[in-house]
A protein has these predicted regions:
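Extracellular/periplasmic, surface-exposed regions of secreted and cell-surface proteins
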Residues: 133, 180, 210, 290, ...
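Conserved small-residue
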Residues: 252-293, 740, 757-857, 971
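Short, solvent-exposed loop/turn motifs
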Residues: 39, 82-85, 189-190, 364, ...
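Extracytoplasmic gating/loop element in the C-terminal half of outer-membrane beta-barrel translocons
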Residues: 431, 599, 828-831, 881-964
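Short Gly/aromatic-enriched secondary-structure transition segments
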Residues: 267-269, 481-483, 546-548, 785-786, ...
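Short aromatic-centered micro-motifs
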Residues: 76, 183, 582, 840, ...
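Short, small/polar-rich motifs associated with maturation and membrane association
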Residues: 1-361, 365-374, 382, 447-448, ...
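Glycine-rich, aromatic-lined ligand/substrate-binding cores of catalytic
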Residues: 857-888
Length: 1002
């Protein structure tokens, strides 16, 4: 397996080095390069002592090279194979066999502040290489990882262009603070926070520039990043040039085109069904029935469309310089134009990536210069149209020449086009919502770092490393709603004036990190010591204003709908860290790390200490197993560690006394002048780190010469000092509720991964990968008095329907985001009885005391599957993932089930198809457990078929077709069961996508 992986990497990184012929004459040599599996494609062939005169082998392993001296020596090299020198001795035709290089074949894994051989790993770490990543329409790098690693759950964003995925590594470790993993790109920790005008921070990175991912899961691997790593670390390595890329540059270009369509719609009544229900409920002679018209409009199909996406990427890589002083380089350009299936939504993105890696001072100084730039333009659709399309009367037409701005609308029949004639309690025309709102943004991002790595002359075991980084994002946007439109009438504050919004935001992270690393082999013993310092500054500035769009003068007192506001905030993080690795005889390993973090966010508890230790036993290298042919790897791992959390989602000053300027609704008059006074905010000076302690035990295994390999891990995590929003005694602070460290959380799970190569021949290759993970999270403490009978926990999970209703709760002894509902009572036919719930506490009254925790949003088990089958130049690849044990509250059904709302307040609501069957006429059953539905699913994510043309020389052409989001097996009754929050309401559907593409290399 290691051979195959290295071969694929080499073809991508080193193939087709250009022939440089010194003169018109000379001695021409032809030949073929092979290994035990056959011809070697992309092997480097050059004249010894003259690296500029070289070539590479073609797809048949053949080469042609002209030299001046017929007795010169040729050098043959290929990643994963031993370099070989062959004296020509006047020959014009030679055959060369290259042998496996076991040292080069050893995988090197990127970890925090360094790399480590895979065999020396002691922590729970998953590495995913470029050839293993997902295919299809991928706008964010993290989508490439879906289903690839056990315990790493990526819930794709909705179907909006550029939408982001929610990432959870082993379920998260907090309730109120961030549960996002730390993202590190080319050694630089970057912000995963979105800013105004962008749907995803990471969508600014071109996925085609990604070389590999490394996921750090347990605390022994993540503790080196301290307070930013409680939820795991995802390390992204981008593609770079290589010192072997000599000669003419190598160019890669690719182009893809795709069409996306929605395949499923909410099951509501059509026009004829609604008329029949209205007649049955009210009668044809009723005023309610008279509200209907004669159109037959499928509103969901009206607002959605076929969406086209185009993407093009081009890159150039090579290397300049000599043998010991050289500079590999890679520069890439990318363009993406993605249309949305919801009309008016679209996104375009341009990216530039440059990687320079000069190596100087006789290979003692290596400088890594990485820069990534992005420009993104987005048109956001008004997603309120999605929920309105479900509820709007299908007997009404889309357009009406006598309607408001040409659209049909609910009005009182007064013949005017003003707010007095608008039924502001009614639903709104979905197409008007889309077309009467113009929401656009432009975002730019720069991520760059310069890393200097110096091996001390005369003492090469000691390396000094300096990393300087900058992550800067800026955005500006406008939102326009024209005056005298339906949605401007429905806004009480606007009263038909419409509005114009301007906003801009910038976010800047600066990083300085320096460390020293000493490593040395002492015979059988190996030691690696590292210590360093980190300084990080995080700064955010934003501006927002909104004013009337009806021509009101700026000097008017009611011109501004929201006061222009500029906000600036910053914080600092200073750290000291160290790591010690020791191994003996490639059998026994120990790793210890220590990090001390200081944050400006905490007033009285600035510093936190985060240690870890891990042990590894390479059982395969023991004498009793060393000669086993069946067993290729067996390593036992045990680790313990602590990480912290200071990203509390409470701003940068939750522990400091701050003041806020009053709004227009709460200003005061002094004399004859109005003033906006400052009011003090509540704060808790004693807030401190959330601390997560993790135990992990793991086993890495391999059989049949590495053709079957994988890992098993079990872990348990304890988070203490959990942040919770808790009541404050009257007069004790400047607020009624305050953030405090009074909660605890437990998290446990098991992960299993297996990969296999069932077939590996010259013409056939078949790989299969499967992973499964179990995770359980339990809240163990929320307040200092959890046993109070009137304390049900922290409510969360707002829903549509009613006012301020929530459907989820954090409760001691239960999973976070459990559904907090009544137990529905059914008749003998299994039909729910309206307004009747089980009196669970037996007090004779139905109230909050009868609610109970029923299921949760998070799955118990997650699965991932991928396979690739190659025959000669054909490759067929597929991937799938599944969740089991996750539940979803179907808010669309709970909103559309009440028949009383069929006709109300002078307008008609469309109903969910179960409304007539349930026949709820008096009570909305928002809190019934019947709407909490099993959302377990199996999704076939994509299937790709590709063909590679065997062009001569250095040219390569591949064509491929992909179908994405192919099928979903589930019992859930909504559109899509994969909803991270667990609440299904107003979701932009994920479309099915058909894609064609080509790749050309020369």
């Amino acid at each position: 397996m290691e051979r195959i992986k290295k071969r694929l990497v080499a073809i991508a990184a080193f193939c087709l080095m250009t022939t440089m012929v010194f003169a018109q004459g000379g001695h021409t040599v032809k030949g073929v390069v092979a290994d035990e599996m056959g011809p070697v494609v992309g092997a480097s062939v050059f004249e010894k002592g003259n690296v500029t005169n070289g070539t590479t082998t073609d797809f048949d392993g053949r080469f042609t090279l002209t030299v001046q001296n017929p007795n010169t020596t040729l050098v043959f090299s290929y990643i994963g194979l031993q370099t070989k020198e062959v004296a020509l001795a006047g020959r014009t035709n030679i055959s060369v066999n290259l042998e496996e290089d076991s040292e080069l074949l050893e995988d090197v894994i990127v970890i925090g502040y360094g790399t480590v051989k895979k065999n020396d790993l002691t922590g729970s770490v998953a590495a995913v290489k470029a050839d293993q990543l997902n295919k299809g329409v991928v706008t964010s790098p993290t989508d490439l990882l879906k289903g690839k690693s056990a315990g790493v759950v990526l819930t794709s964003g909705d179907g909006a262009p550029g939408s982001s995925a929610t990432i959870r590594v082993r379920g998260g470790s907090s309730l109120k603070a961030s549960n996002d993993p730390l993202i590190v790109i080319d050694g630089l920790p970057v912000s995963n926070d979105g800013i105004s005008g962008t749907s995803s921070a990471l969508s600014s990175i071109n996925p085609s520039d990604i070389e590999s991912f490394t996921v750090l899961k347990d605390a022994s691997a993540t503790a080196i990043y301290g307070s930013r790593a409680s939820n795991g670390v995802i390390m992204i390595t981008t593609k770079k040039g290589s010192k072997f890329d000599t000669g003419k540059p190598h160019v890669d270009v690719d182009f893809t085109s795709s069409i996306s369509q929605n395949t499923k719609y909410v099951d509501v009544l059509n026009a004829s069904e609604l008329k029949a229900l209205m007649e049955k409920t009210y009668g044809q002679a009723s005023e309610a029935y008279g509200l209907l018209t004669d159109s037959d409009t499928d509103w969901q199909r009206e607002i959605f469309q076929l969406a086209q996406t185009y993407e093009a990427n081009a890159s150039i890589r090579g290397s300049v310089g000599g043998k010991h002083n050289y500079m590999p380089y890679r520069v890439s350009l990318g363009y993406l134009n993605q249309g949305g299936t919801l009309k008016t939504s679209k996104m375009s993105r341009e990216t530039l990536s440059a990687n320079l890696t000069p190596t100087l001072m006789d290979e003692h100084l290596t400088i890594s210069l990485n820069a990534k730039l992005m420009n993104m333009d987005t048109r956001f659709a008004n997603t309120s149209a999605i929920s309105q399309a479900v509820q709007y009367d299908p007997t009404k037409p889309v357009y009406d020449e006598h309607g408001l701005n040409g659209y049909s609308w609910w009005n009182y029949g007064r013949g005017t086009y003003d707010i007095a004639n608008c039924n502001t309690m009614a639903n709104q025309n979905p197409m008007a919502l889309l077309n009467d709102k113009n929401d656009r943004s432009n975002a730019k991002r720069f991520i760059g770092n310069a890393q200097f790595d110096y091996k001390i002359h005369g003492f090469e075991d000691l390396r000094l490393n300096l990393n300087l980084g900058l992550d800067h994002t800026s955005s500006l946007g406008t939102v326009d709603v024209a005056p005298n439109t339906e949605q401007s009438f429905h806004n009480t504050k606007q009263s038909g004036s419409g509005y114009h919004t301007n906003y801009n935001q910038q976010h800047t992270d600066k990083t300085l990190e320096a460390y020293a690393d000493y490593s040395h082999d002492f015979g059988k013993a190996f030691i690696d010591l590292m210590g360093g310092y980190s300084w990080q500054h995080f700064y955010t500035e934003s501006f927002n204003e909104q004013y009337k769009a009806d021509g009101t003068q700026p000097t008017a007192s009611d011109y501004y709908l929201s006061t222009p506001l500029t906000n600036k905030t910053e914080y600092f993080l200073v750290s000291f860290f160290g790591r010690a690795n020791f191994s003996y005889d490639n059998r026994y390993m120990i790793t210890a790390t220590l990090r001390r973090d200081g944050t400006s966010r905490f007033a009285n508890n600035k510093w936190g200490l985060f240690p870890s230790v891990a042990l590894g036993w390479n059982i395969k290298n023991e004498g009793f197993l060393r000669d086993s042919d069946a067993l290729s790897a067996l390593k036992l791992r045990l680790s313990y560690g602590q990480t912290g959390q200071q990203d509390l989602q409470a701003g940068d000053y939750p522990t400091l006394a701050t003041y806020t300027m009053n709004t227009n609704q709460s200003y005061y008059v002094f004399g004859n002048q109005w003033f906006h006074p400052l009011r003090p905010d509540g704060y808790n000076a004693d807030l401190k780190w959330e601390t997560t302690t993790t135990w992990n035990v793991g086993l890495d295994y391999g059989f049949a010469g590495g053709r079957i390999y994988g890992s098993i891990d079990a872990y348990k995590r304890f988070t203490k000092d959990l942040l919770n929003y808790t009541p404050v005694a009257a007069g004790a602070n400047l607020t009624n509720y305050l953030d405090a460290n009074i909660g605890d959380l437990e998290n446990e799970g098991v992960e299993f991964e297996i990969n296999a190569i069932p077939v590996e021949t010259r013409d056939w290759n078949w790989t299969v990968g499967f992973n499964v993970a179990y995770n359980k999270t339990t809240v163990t403490r929320l307040t200092t008095d959890d046993e109070r009978p009137d304390y049900y926990g922290v409510t969360t999970g707002g829903i549509s329907g009613g006012t301020g209703n929530t459907i989820q709760v954090h409760q001691t002894g239960q999973s976070p985001y459990s559904f907090f509902v009544y137990q529905q009572v059914y008749d003998t036919n299994g039909k729910p009885i309206e307004g009747m719930y089980v009196d669970r506490n037996g007090d004779g009254t139905i109230n909050d005391g009868d609610k109970y925790c029923y299921q949760k949003a998070a799955p118990d088990f997650t699965y991932g599957f991928n396979t690739s089958l190659s025959f000669k130049n054909w490759t067929l690849a597929a991937s799938a993932h599944a969740n089991v044990g996750n539940y979803v509250y179907n808010n669309i059904a709970s909103n559309g089930d009440l028949l009383t709302d069929l006709a109300t307040n002078g307008f008609v609501n469309n109903r969910y198809r179960t409304a007539e069957e349930h026949n709820f006429t008096n009570f909305a059953q928002y809190f019934s457990d019947m709407y909490v539905q099993n959302a377990s699913f199996l999704k076939l994510d994509n299937v790709t078929l590709s063909y590679r043309f065997g062009l001569k020389g250095r040219h390569s052409l591949s064509v491929f077709g992909t179908v994405q989001n192919i099928a979903c097996l589930t019992t859930y009754k909504g559109i899509d069961p994969e909803i991270y929050s667990g609440i299904d309401n107003n979701m932009y559907p994920r479309p099915r996508t058909y894609m064609l593409g080509l790749k050309y290399n020369f």
